Amino acid sequence: MSKAKDTGILRFDDTPLAATFPLVAIITSKVVGGVKIVGRKGLDSTEFSIVGTQDSLKGSYVIAKYLARTTPSLSLYGENALSASKIDEFIDKFAHLKSEKFNEFLKEMNEYLTLRAFLIGFNLTLADIVLFARIKMVKEIQEEINKLGKTIPHLNRWYGYLSQLESFVEADNAFNGKKETKASGKAGAEGTAATTEKVAPQKGAMGWVGNFEALNLPGLVEGKVVTRFPPEPSGYMHIGHCKAAIINNYYAEKYNGKIIIRFDDTNPSKEKEEYVENIIKDINNLGIKYEKITHTSDYFDLIHDYAIQMIKEGIAYCDDTPQVKMSEERDNAIESVHRNNSVEKNLEMFDEMKKATEQGVKCVLRAKLDMAHIDKAFRDPAIYRCNSTPHHRTGDKYKVYPLYDFACPIVDSVEGITHALRSNEYNNKRNLYNHYLEILHLENKPYISDYSRLSFFNVLLSKRKLQHFVDTGLVSGWTDPRLPTLQGITRRGLTVAALKEFILSQGASAANTTLDLGKLFVGNKAVLEPTCPRYTAIAKATAVKFTLSNGPTLPEVKDCLKYAKDPSMGTKKVTFSNNLLLEGDDCNQIKEGEEVTLMNWGNAIVETLQRNENGDVVSMTGKLHLEGDVKKTDKKLSWLSSDCADTVTVVLQDYDYIITKPKLEDGDDLDTFTNKNSKFEIEAFTDENILTLKLNDKIQFERRGFFNVDQVGDGVKPYILIYIPSGPIKPAGAALYPFKKVEKVAAPVNPKPTAKKQEKQSKK
């Protein structure tokens, strides 16, 4: 990247840790780029000179606001007047904080950030920068954060994420008097100078923040936007449904509008109140603040009246043609023998349908559109069909139900929806949606638009197929960690924050792509890394006893940090003794006389190894060598004392894909490509620290990875922890055996083309 011309010069007093240090202006300059930063000790004020003019600005906040306004593409000052005002409101609040309110304020911010990656919207703004700077510069706030510790996990996550961004790291180094290691100019006699390059917007954990302008939606009026999320209560929400909910909510939030949750309950054969309750639970977990919950069944009488209106206007008719024949006629543009029935005849047949008589159940009500239309969706589609199954809300009041394509535009219009956003699997129905609005003379005409459907390799998002897995017992239920339902994938450890960022990072593009599920978990790792305490687990079946001749003969219990990089997480109890348990797979790679490092303790020398008939190490002896250099050892080993007050046995689980083929094609037999062995588990030893964990707590077993607490032990049932992937899914439970040595097979060397030619010539 070529160096861009500087647009301004920022001069400030660079005395480390000074109360007047312009951290807000420096971070903003780093984010925006193109600012020459000059620090000199003793300057009276912070000043920003605009290159090419005689103008200058003074004051850290004033300079930051100017830089944010000059780079609107970064949205540092929000995306509209409302978000800019909210940013100003936050900045004013942060600036006038009183010390006696610090505790209350931090708890408030933690709750506010529960389901947010940033303070305003979905991008970094000045509000984030100012709050970060206040925390960094006010010692009393830092002390209060340390006191609150794990009780403010969401604020800690937010702060930890910003702390690792390059712009913040460089500014923090300057604040602490450290020399920059990147993009630094040479130190002059009078001070230091650094010129930054023009940079693109900050990346999130998933990549660039998605482009939501791609849909080019008209009529996005502040305070007037009304969207909806219309799930069918025929199963649990999966991540595809989550995308629909999050994108519709994005526009409602961005334009200070509303989102309505509407259950499309038009097929009683598949629907259950259980599904309704769990979908509402999932929507709440996504942090969506909906205006109200409605049901299509609230409008059954109204939709019925529109159907009668169509019959009377001669644009709907009843048809008892068998389904297979009707499909063939539609494919071949052949009109039904009932197409020109009289209005009276159609009303009579529709009445039979409503009574679910023997003749009535053979019929459907069809819209009379255009059987010769090039778009087959217009070839007299069905709009009502019979179903005698009792409805979970209305019981047996109705025997006929509207189809989704007919009911949806009616209810959208009546509920005042302005924008209906749905995945492009419905793209071929968009014109039909608008046509119903026209022929029914509905005044409110929502704008309908499509975005790409989520698709992952080796993952099915079809509710029918997911239901098959549940019904056949392949999985334990809709919340099984192998399923892509929200409740399933969060049991596997995916955080809602990571899921939301992933979906928003995709933007609203209509281009379909199939992704690796591991990409979801890469972003999840960025959320977990700064927030998870560290513990130790040793595989039980292969644990090796290591006896130290000079170790503590009586167990010594010490308080150690749960996470060395974040003391605010508190401490854990660690037992030190002369009898340790080590990972068998680690020990199989150790040689007698080798010096190794016992993590968080020091070095030890292995003197003897005892092996079984298979050649596996079963026990070792050695001695501590704490004066040894941990940097010079090849092996850093996890360990537990076998003399712990409470050695707790836990179950560690991991899962493989259910589907063995990356993408199923039409005609593929589902059972042929179903993995019948996709759940794996081992027992492991841990210590008493595990007894403090609660359901869904997330931790890291050092060197093993992140785990989610799926079951809390009670003396009868064990603790169960599920492995959380941090990238591509490892096959066959391999994640449970991270220390097993894998023999690498050398790849065959292909001779270069010139070598091949020489070989041929020599043969000739």
Curated annotation (Swiss-Prot):
Name of the protein in its database record: Probable glutamate--tRNA ligase, cytoplasmic
Keyword match Protein biosynthesis: yes
Presence of keyword Aminoacyl-tRNA synthetase: yes
Positions with a binding annotation for ATP: 238, 425, 460-464
Chain's role: Catalyzes the attachment of glutamate to tRNA(Glu) in a two-step reaction: glutamate is first activated by ATP to form Glu-AMP and then transferred to the acceptor end of tRNA(Glu).
SUPFAM superfamilies with a match to the protein in the record: GST C-terminal domain-like (SSF47616), Nucleotidylyl transferase (SSF52374), Ribosomal protein L25-like (SSF50715)
Family: Belongs to the class-I aminoacyl-tRNA synthetase family. Glutamate--tRNA ligase type 2 subfamily.
E.C. number: 6.1.1.17
Location relative to the cell: Cytoplasm
Single biological process term from Gene Ontology: glutamyl-tRNA aminoacylation
Motif 'KMSKS' region, residue numbers: 460-464
Gene this protein is translated from: gluS
Pfam families: GST_C, tRNA-synt_1c, tRNA-synt_1c_C, tRNA-synt_1c_C2
Keyword annotations of the record: Aminoacyl-tRNA synthetase, ATP-binding, Cytoplasm, Ligase, Nucleotide-binding, Protein biosynthesis, RNA-binding
Gene Ontology CC annotation, any one: methionyl glutamyl tRNA synthetase complex
Catalytic activity: tRNA(Glu) + L-glutamate + ATP = L-glutamyl-tRNA(Glu) + AMP + diphosphate
Enzyme class: ligase
Gene induction: Down-regulated by growth on bacteria.
Main location: cytoplasm
Binding site for L-glutamate: 228-230, 264, 404-408, 422
GO molecular function: ATP binding; glutamate-tRNA ligase activity; RNA binding
Family annotation (PANTHER family): GLUTAMATE--TRNA LIGASE, GLUTAMINE-TRNA LIGASE
HAMAP family in alphabetical order: Glu_tRNA_synth_type2
InterPro entries named among the record's database cross-references: aa-tRNA-synth_I_CS (IPR001412), Gln/Glu-tRNA_Ligase (IPR050132), Glu-tRNA-synth_arc/euk (IPR004526), Glu/Gln-tRNA-synth (IPR000924), Glu/Gln-tRNA-synth_Ib_cat-dom (IPR020058), Glu/Gln-tRNA-synth_Ib_codon-bd (IPR020059), Glutathione-S-Trfase_C-like (IPR010987), Glutathione-S-Trfase_C_sf (IPR036282)
